Amino acid sequence: MPPKPDPSSSGEAPQAMQPAPPPRAEGHMYAQPEGPGQNEEAMLEQRLIRLIELMATKRHNSTLSNISFEIGRPSLEPTPEMRRNPENPYSRFSIDELFKMEIRSVSNNMANTEQMAQITADIAGLGVPTEHVAGVILKVVIMCASVSSSVYLDPAGTVEFPTGAVPLDSIIAIMKNRAGLRKVCRLYAPVVWNYMLVQNRPPSDWQAMGFQWNARFAAFDTFDYVTNGAAIQPVEGLIRRPTPEETIAHNAHKSMAIDKSNRNERLANTNVEYTGGMLGAEIVRNHRNAINQ
């Protein structure tokens, strides 16, 4: 078989390979880059949009003033040498520790929770529905503001509730037996105070007791417990605090009433051999000299 001829040895030159044509640009993926002026304009537009969004986040319709956030502030951690030792009764309490303490106000001069629970159970035992017991107690206390909360009180009438009525004698006897009528009235003094102001209804006998018009709301036994923190408080708080004029008028009448009721307390014995069948000598106080210099 004869050999094939070598193309390089022939006189004809070999044909050169044609270069591949560049790919065609299709769509935006292969778009030509924009000029430097167009890039700067787009960047400025993006900055403008971001600036508008930033300014929108700062819009508000209120401006705080006189700022003070004491409640809820982050607690400070004392240094080791200043930490209080709970085992040492002489270690000092910081203001933060005192602020976090929760100690309820108490008073031995008013009915406590145990006594009120006994009173509530006894009144319910009379047949008063449990949902009306609190209202019955409050009505009795308001009535006592006009008559008296004395242990010698002999009431007349009834206390009505939506489904019936109960004699005042029964309710007051229960209160006297369980806690003392005046102690129960002291517990509700702030509520009674608000009731009288809302209804514009001062104690009935304020004029007979010698009170002036501006001090007429102070003419009840438990006035001096209106601002007591251990008493039952109205939801909104006191409508107003007692005025100095009301306080002075109440204390003056209270002093005279105590002296009048304590005439016999000066006697060592109440037998007729000591008293002669008469009340004790009247206690006389000269209040006019109280302001003499």
From Swiss-Prot:
Function of the protein: Required for genome encapsidation. Forms ribonucleoprotein complexes along with TGB1 helicase and viral RNA.
GO molecular function, one term: structural molecule activity
Family: Belongs to the potexviruses coat protein family.
Listed InterPro entries: Carlavirus_coat_N (IPR013569), Pltvir_coat (IPR000052)
Protein name in the entry: Capsid protein
Locations listed in the record: Virion
Keyword list, A-Z: Capsid protein, Helical capsid protein, Ribonucleoprotein, Virion
Disordered: region residues: 1-39
Natural source organism: Potato virus S (strain Peruvian)
GO cellular component: helical viral capsid; ribonucleoprotein complex
Pfam families noted in UniProt: Flexi_CP, Flexi_CP_N
Anything else known: The N- and the C-terminus of this capsid protein may be exposed on the surface of the virus particle. The central core sequence may be important in maintaining correct tertiary structure of the capsid protein and/or play a role in interacting with the viral RNA.
Record flagged with keyword Ribonucleoprotein: yes
Domain of life: Viruses
Chief site of localization: virion
